[in-house]
From Swiss-Prot:
Protein role: Catalyzes phosphorolysis of the pyrimidine nucleosides uridine, thymidine and 2'-deoxyuridine with the formation of the corresponding pyrimidine base and ribose-1-phosphate.
Binding site residues for substrate: R168, K187
Gene: pdp
Binding site for phosphate: K81, H82, S83, T92, K108, M109, S110, T120
Residues reported to bind K(+): G88, T90, L243, A246, E255
E.C. code: 2.4.2.2
Cofactor: K(+)
Any one of the GO CC terms: cytosol
Protein's recorded name: Pyrimidine-nucleoside phosphorylase
Reaction catalyzed: uridine + phosphate = alpha-D-ribose 1-phosphate + uracil; thymidine + phosphate = 2-deoxy-alpha-D-ribose 1-phosphate + thymine; 2'-deoxyuridine + phosphate = 2-deoxy-alpha-D-ribose 1-phosphate + uracil
Amino acid sequence: MRMVDLIEKKRDGHALTKEEIQFIIEGYTKGDIPDYQMSALAMAIFFRGMNEEETAELTMAMVHSGDTIDLSRIEGIKVDKHSTGGVGDTTTLVLGPLVASVGVPVAKMSGRGLGHTGGTIDKLESVPGFHVEITNDEFIDLVNKNKIAVVGQSGNLTPADKKLYALRDVTATVNSIPLIASSIMSKKIAAGADAIVLDVKTGVGAFMKDLNDAKALAKAMVDIGNRVGRKTMAIISDMSQPLGYAIGNALEVKEAIDTLKGEGPEDFQELCLVLGSHMVYLAEKASSLEEARHMLEKAMKDGSALQTFKTFLAAQGGDASVVDDPSKLPQAKYIIELEAKEDGYVSEIVADAVGTAAMWLGAGRATKESTIDLAVGLVLRKKVGDAVKKGESLVTIYSNREQVDDVKQKLYENIRISATPVQAPTLIYDKIS
């Protein structure tokens, strides 16, 4: 087989076979196929697309390019959730303990975040003492015992995806649905998931800004999962404004604690219940989505979700008393209110710009080397559709520097107020299974 023939085949709009896809991925991972040929193929895929079978074969070739995590010693169906990312997306912190409290095993591998705030691990590390440095055996034992544990990403998972992703980034071939779908699904499958729930975001703060693109990506990922024997369901949710109120690490942990008590922001709590009920249903702990949701609402009400969170934190060295006393979380030196300059209704909160403002305070990383300030961030006091009076707080800024004019300016530019009432956006657009 010659790579040039395969590039030509895809350029002319033909489907590649399983053997051809394996040849490409193995050769590229080993370094036998140079970047310039892989770039040409990526661009051919960008314009010509791939059918469902090719996309599934590409996914599995990337899974087999490196190590895979074996979770077979964990009892039950392992369901993983993936969000395509957004601002203030704390769902993992709530969903883990919430579904674990009704018996769904949560074996979560998480990363540290690049971007507006930290990743799940950074957020959890704002709990004093909490750590993810546990061995694979400890990880599996903890999940069997408490139904939940979180470990840092390790091992050589999907090296083909890492290499191809870096190449796509610099060759203008990121926005190809088969390439995005196979990239996301290969990571989830390599990490040992039996079933997968996807939260595909759409709107200005999302990677897929257009609803039709978001639907196409969701359908592609659900199709891959079902073709390779991993039951997969997707939800398409709104990211035109940040989710919940908190943007920042310790601030999001506090919001997660409130939500586990059933006292969280309405939109955030609803999304957690919808995603969670899909996880419980796929784990075969409930016979319908309605029954699953009822179980989760009960776990919030009777305190078992919160207790599971405490047990989880303590098992990994964390001070679980932060759950009852959030003042033990890292605290910012300065608390500054951003006041509304006029009466009216909040008409727009540009999610990614608000995320950038939180990052300027130190809540996120610009590069892998940056340090992160776990205490700082923003808490929205109003969401789209809310009425506001002049002088009322729009956002509370938690900062470790006194002077925050740059952050205020950014927020004023990106939180718009209209004289006439505004409808709050739809939270969930579609469900795909």
